[in-house]
């Protein structure tokens, strides 16, 4: 009769445990990177395209509290009236700049060129609109992970948008404290 050999599990348990631990730690940075997003903004991404020298960058980061910090920088942009995160079909999901809002008791309407910081702040669940109204910032981030949303910057000369860009996952984002 043949003897069966049993696999000596006890002997390999430490090796298996360390391997599982290492593999799980490798996946954590990949998940963490999904909390950072970026969009490169230009008139070429608009539909129809807009002939402009204006450009911009929008950076987003999911903060530990579950809210989303953002910063939008632009160059050669004149008379900005608003900026939104929108679905590809144009439905607005969150406002990230509104020149007609009252700030410190007065209406702020930018004049001249914007060369640098246009807007920075934090998006909370209560800021979401359209199909995301009543949902969470995580729902917005899930759309960003799928390249399903844009940042659109509207100006007095191009009320439907002068520059825009698709928001995509990134290795770097924006942290409110910076």
Where are the predicted features?
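Bacterial N-terminal signal peptides that target proteins for export
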Residues: 2-18
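Metal-centered catalytic cores of metalloenzymes
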Residues: 2, 28-83, 87-178
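Bacterial N-terminal signal peptides
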Residues: 15-27
């Amino acid at each position: 009769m043949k003897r069966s050999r049993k696999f000596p599990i006890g002997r390999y348990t430490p090796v298996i445990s360390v391997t599982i631990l290492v593999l799980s730690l490798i996946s954590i940075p990949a998940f963490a990177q999904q909390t950072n997003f970026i969009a490169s903004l230009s008139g070429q991404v608009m539909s129809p395209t807009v002939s402009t020298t204006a450009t911009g960058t929008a950076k987003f980061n999911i903060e530990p509290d579950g809210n989303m910090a953002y910063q939008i920088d632009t160059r050669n942009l004149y008379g900005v009236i608003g900026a939104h995160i929108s679905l590809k079909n144009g439905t607005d999901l969150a406002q990230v700049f509104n020149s007609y809002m009252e700030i410190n008791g007065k209406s702020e309407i930018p004049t001249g060129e914007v060369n640098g910081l246009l807007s920075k702040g934090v998006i909370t669940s209560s800021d979401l609109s359209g199909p995301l109204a009543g949902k969470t910032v995580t729902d917005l981030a899930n759309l960003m992970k799928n390249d399903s949303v844009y940042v659109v910057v509207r100006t007095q000369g191009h009320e439907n948008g002068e520059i825009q860009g698709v928001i995509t996952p990134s290795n770097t984002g924006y942290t409110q404290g910076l």
